[in-house]
Amino acid sequence: MASLDRVKVLVLGDSGVGKSSLVHLLCQNQVLGNPSWTVGCSVDVRLHEYREGTPEEKTYYIELWDVGGSVGSASSVKSTRAVFYNAVNGIILVHDLTNKKSSQNLYRWSLEALNRDLQPTGVLVTNGDYDREQFADNQIPLLVIGTKLDQIPEAKRSEVLTRTAFLAEDFNAEEINLDCTNTRCLAAGSSNAVKLSRFFDKVIEKRYSREGNLIPGFSDRKRFAGGNFKSLHYD
């Protein structure tokens, strides 16, 4: 296999929301049997067919960086975590549909990551106030994913999904709600799979295009040799 271009996507959210299970499902198409806490950052890779089924179809590596920790961590922890926010091409914000606090904390996660990207001085936001206009010029594609959909009682599902729809609107992002213990939730052709593919296409276009045309290469581009690959863990 020829070497492939890659993009870097952060996976952010509170501890316990199911980020590791989500990444495993996205990259291995399998349910993660024994999820554990992520210390530092764990990186897994997914193959993605850009514009699949069109003459522009091309295979890319999607690096998914599962960042551990709590949004309320001490400033020293945030400073350490900030190293993972460099050269980001996309962000997946993950929240637990059964935990409203994890949804609210996505605003703080986005501020932390985007401010690190927009302000290379390392200044991080410490309060939880979110102004939609604050990142109006943000060019990094976002996707909001709600986990543990299976744990939402049918009687409350409409209320919860309405709330998450407003959440995604705040980020000007599409939303996916799923059960990470069910591989069918991302089955080919499903609405979730279409949204996910559309998000990855957008990330690739932002990274490798100029005025809408894909560019052959960038001087800072990293390449991966074809063949087997495995997860990387940064502690």
Swiss-Prot record:
Pfam families: Roc
Xref: InterPro entries: P-loop_NTPase
GO biological process: B cell differentiation; natural killer cell differentiation; regulation of protein lipidation; regulation of Ras protein signal transduction; T cell differentiation in thymus
Family matches, as SMART domains: RAB
Superkingdom of the organism of origin: Eukaryota
Gene3D superfamilies: P-loop containing nucleotide triphosphate hydrolases
PROSITE patterns, alphabetized: RAB
Positions that bind GTP: G16, V17, G18, K19, S20, S21, K148, L149, D150, D179, C180
UniProt-listed SUPFAM superfamilies: P-loop containing nucleoside triphosphate hydrolases
Keywords: GTP-binding, Nucleotide-binding
Any one Gene Ontology molecular-function term assigned to this protein's record: GTP binding
Family matches, as CDD domains: RabL3
Region: Small GTPase-like, residue numbers: 1-235
Subunit structure and binding partners: Homodimer.
Function: Required for KRAS signaling regulation and modulation of cell proliferation. Regulator of KRAS prenylation, and probably prenylation of other small GTPases. Required for lymphocyte development and function. Not required for myeloid cell development.
Family under the similarity heading: Belongs to the small GTPase superfamily. Rab family.
Protein name according to UniProt: Rab-like protein 3
Organism: Xenopus tropicalis (Western clawed frog)
Gene from which the chain derives: rabl3
